[in-house]
From Swiss-Prot:
GO cellular component, as recorded: mitochondrial membrane
Enzyme Commission number(s): 7.1.1.2
Main location: mitochondrion
PANTHER family: NADH UBIQUINONE OXIDOREDUCTASE SUBUNIT ND6, NADH-UBIQUINONE OXIDOREDUCTASE CHAIN 6
Statement: the UniProt record of this protein carries the keyword Transmembrane: yes
Underlying gene: MT-ND6
Protein name: NADH-ubiquinone oxidoreductase chain 6
Compartments (UniProt record): Mitochondrion membrane
Family membership noted in the UniProt record: Belongs to the complex I subunit 6 family.
Catalysis performed (reactions): a ubiquinone + NADH + 5 H(+)(in) = a ubiquinol + NAD(+) + 4 H(+)(out)
Top EC category: translocase
Keyword Electron transport: yes
Length: 173
């Protein structure tokens, strides 16, 4: 119970970091940590295969885009989160998160949530989550190929867009 609450609060903490970033560098790190803690929450609840697939697809596809975004920005002196502006942005989102928790506690019945997992129905020879790999390659093979093609196409589009801007932004290289 306490571990899932710890990762839940960590997830909200990193989401606040994503939404209140004042520099691209901290936003990317916060987004990667948000994905990591979200996948840990999924794995803790019993969806280990889903967490692994989401984490690998997310990091494999999106970090390429983030790397090119950081290359485009090239801030020599990025602002830090400890600056007054960053503290004010983070404070707004913390207050908003606290209000959502207080309002949602009564409306959505958050207090009744337990620490049940996917396999809480009883003992079984095969876990519910372990059949995901065979289904991914059997039924979901076409969708997997389309996602791969989309990521590949996005990679080349961003590469072409960044190519001309990189020469303008960094004339010394």
């Amino acid at each position: 119970m306490y571990v899932s609450m710890l990762f839940g609060f960590s997830y909200v903490f990193w989401l606040i970091g994503v939404s209140s970033n004042i520099s691209v560098y901290y936003g990317v790190v916060s987004l990667v940590c948000t994905a990591g803690t979200g996948c840990v929450v999924l794995a803790w609840k019993g969806g280990s295969f889903l967490a692994l697939v989401l984490f690998l697809i997310y990091l494999g596809g999106m970090l390429v885009i983030f790397a090119y975004s950081i290359t485009l920005v090239m801030e020599p002196f990025p602002e830090v989160m400890g600056d007054w502006v960053g503290v004010m942005h983070a404070g707004k989102y913390v207050v908003l998160a606290v209000v959502f928790v207080l309002v949602g506690w009564g409306w959505w019945g958050v207090g009744e949530c337990g620490d049940g997992v996917v396999d809480a129905g009883g003992l079984s020879i095969v876990r519910v989550d372990s059949s995901g790999l065979s289904l991914l390659y059997a039924i979901g093979g076409g969708a997997l190929m389309m996602a791969m093609f989309g990521l590949f196409l996005t990679f080349f589009i961003v590469l072409v867009l960044v190519q001309g801007l990189f020469r303008v932004a960094c004339p010394t290289i």
